[in-house]
C-alpha cells in the first residue's frame, strides 16, 4: 500500500505541476486528489519544492538512462549519419511520453522565481551529462574524413536547436512528426551547419 500511495502522490503531483505550474499547485490540491492528509505527503517529501525536484530529477534521469542504453556507433559512420540517428532516437523517446518533455519545457520556459536558479543549475548538469553520453555513443566523430573534435560542441548545440524545434512543433501542434519530415529537415539543417 505504501508504494501505491507514493506512486499516486507522484503521478498526481506530476499532472498538477504540468497542468497548473509550480506556483499554482499546492499540497492541499494534491492531498485532495490523492485522498490523503498533508502529513502523508510530508512523510515522503520534505516540501512542495522537494516533491517538484524529485519529479524533475526522475524525468531527467529516465532520459539519461535511455541515452545510456543507446549503443556506441561505428567510428567509420559519418558524423551526419550519427547525429541523425541520435536525433531520431531522441524523437522516439519524446514521442513515447511527450508529457515528460512538456513538464521539462514548462519548467524552463516559465521557471518559478523562487527556484529558477536551481532549475538552471540542474539543467546545466543534465545537459553536460547528455553531451558526455552523446560523445561516447559517437566514438570519434568525423565528417569529410576530418576529425572535428574541437568543433563538436558547436555541432551538438546546433543539433539541440533542431531537436528543440521539432519537439516544440510536436508539443504545440500535438502531431507526431514523421521520419520523412525529420529526414528532409535534417538534410537541410546539416548543410547549413
Predicted features and spans:
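N-terminal positioning helix adjacent to the helix-turn-helix/winged-helix DNA-binding module
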Residues: 4-5, 9-12
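Helix-turn-helix
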Residues: 8, 16-50, 54
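Conserved amphipathic alpha-helical interaction elements at protein-protein interfaces in regulatory
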Residues: 15, 19, 36, 47, ...
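Alpha-helical DNA-contacting segments of helix-turn-helix folds
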Residues: 53-59, 66
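Hydrophobic alpha-helical connector segments
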Residues: 54, 69-97, 152-159, 182
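Amphipathic alpha-helical packing segments from all-alpha helical-bundle domains
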Residues: 64, 68, 113-143, 153-157, ...
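C-terminal peripheral helix-coil segments that are non-catalytic and often amphipathic
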Residues: 92, 132-139, 157-193
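Amphipathic alpha-helical segments used for helix-helix packing
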Residues: 95-117, 168-172
Amino acid at each position: 500500500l505504501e508504494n501505491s500511495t507514493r506512486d499516486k502522490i507522484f503521478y498526481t503531483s506530476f499532472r498538477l505541476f504540468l497542468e497548473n505550474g509550480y506556483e499554482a499547485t499546492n499540497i492541499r490540491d494534491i492531498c485532495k486528489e490523492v485522498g490523503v492528509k498533508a502529513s502523508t505527503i510530508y512523510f515522503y517529501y520534505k516540501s512542495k519544492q522537494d516533491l517538484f525536484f524529485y519529479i524533475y530529477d526522475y524525468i531527467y534521469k529516465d532520459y539519461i538512462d535511455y541515452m545510456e542504453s543507446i549503443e556506441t556507433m561505428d567510428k567509420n559512420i559519418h558524423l551526419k549519419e550519427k547525429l541523425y540517428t541520435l536525433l531520431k532516437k531522441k524523437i522516439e523517446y519524446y514521442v513515447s511520453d511527450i508529457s515528460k518533455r512538456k513538464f521539462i519545457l514548462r519548467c524552463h520556459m516559465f521557471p518559478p522565481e523562487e527556484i529558477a536558479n536551481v532549475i538552471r543549475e540542474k539543467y546545466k548538469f543534465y545537459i553536460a551529462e547528455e553531451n558526455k553520453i552523446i560523445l561516447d555513443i559517437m566514438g570519434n566523430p568525423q565528417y569529410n574524413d576530418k576529425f572535428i573534435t574541437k568543433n563538436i560542441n558547436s555541432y551538438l548545440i546546433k543539433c539541440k536547436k533542431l531537436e528543440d524545434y521539432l519537439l516544440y512543433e510536436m508539443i504545440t501542434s500535438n502531431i507526431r512528426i514523421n521520419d520523412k519530415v525529420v529526414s528532409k529537415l535534417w538534410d537541410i539543417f546539416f548543410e547549413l551547419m
